[in-house]
Amino acid sequence: MDSKIIVALDYETEAEALSLVDQIDPSLCRLKVGKEMFTTLGTNFVKQLQERKFDVFLDLKFHDIPNTVARAVRSAADLGVWMVDLHASGGLRMMEEAKNILEPYGKDAPILIGVTVLTSMEDLDLLQIGINASPMEQVIRLAHLTQRAGLDGVVCSPQEVEILRKNLGSDFKLVTPGIRPVGSEFGDQRRVMTPSAAVRSGADYLVIGRPITQAENPAEVLRSINASLANI
């Protein structure tokens, strides 16, 4: 099955992460490796996940001068990851160079997505960095810029999914963190939604961490979430 679930691996050690990974089925999810784990464990950890047949979303949110970001994206492609992201606030030229460097990879290129507004940020957070707009307004602005640059989609909170789907079309990928199954705590995510509600709104992929990784039976939780999405 082509699962919509991306499990966020937020662990302090390789042993903890692989203990979880070895309990779940690669046909039921993809895996997200972020800054903490990648900085600690490097490319070898990604390769171990790939050897277990998991698609990997390399969530490093590149944001630098265009040439540097493009080369980093190329390195991610050489690593064979399924998806990689960058900050849309890095600008049009940065995103275009990142997209262009993937042309030689053809169908083997990773999905390239832009990060709009982090789901932990609220109006005051944006104002404090000089952005006089609501999170929704800034997300829409950056999502349009991302599409103009030719990227495959964006990361956005569940509340922005519906309006982005209407504005950006059916082929533009929407990757949604801030997903909490019914009964889960919100944690540090401020704009959240259940898996089924997010998919109904138009999300393509759902990033879920602690509700799965900290569950007593992660495999069962994963199966349950997939089942809840089966008929949507």
UniProtKB/Swiss-Prot annotation:
GO biological process: 'de novo' pyrimidine nucleobase biosynthetic process; 'de novo' UMP biosynthetic process
Binding residues annotated for substrate, in chain numbering: 10, 32, 59-68, 119, 180, 189, 209-210
This protein's GO CC annotations: cytosol
Keyword Lipid metabolism listed: no
InterPro entries named in the record: Aldolase_TIM (IPR013785), OMPdecase (IPR014732), OMPdecase_AS (IPR018089), OMPdecase_bac (IPR047596), OMPdeCOase_dom (IPR001754), RibuloseP-bd_barrel (IPR011060)
PROSITE patterns per the UniProt record, alphabetical: OMPDECASE
Pfam families for this protein: OMPdecase
Residue positions of the active site: K61
Gene Ontology molecular functions: orotidine-5'-phosphate decarboxylase activity
Pathway participation: Pyrimidine metabolism; UMP biosynthesis via de novo pathway; UMP from orotate: step 2/2
Top-rank EC class of the record's enzyme: lyase
Cited SUPFAM superfamilies: Ribulose-phoshate binding barrel (SSF51366)
Keyword tags: Decarboxylase, Lyase, Pyrimidine biosynthesis
Reactions catalysed according to its record: orotidine 5'-phosphate + H(+) = UMP + CO2
Gene3D superfamilies, per database record: Aldolase class I
Residues forming coiled coils: none
EC number(s) reported in the record: 4.1.1.23
Function: Catalyzes the decarboxylation of orotidine 5'-monophosphate (OMP) to uridine 5'-monophosphate (UMP).
Subunit relationships: Homodimer.
Protein family: Belongs to the OMP decarboxylase family. Type 1 subfamily.
Name of the protein: Orotidine 5'-phosphate decarboxylase
Organism whose genome encodes this protein: Actinobacillus succinogenes (strain ATCC 55618 / DSM 22257 / CCUG 43843 / 130Z)
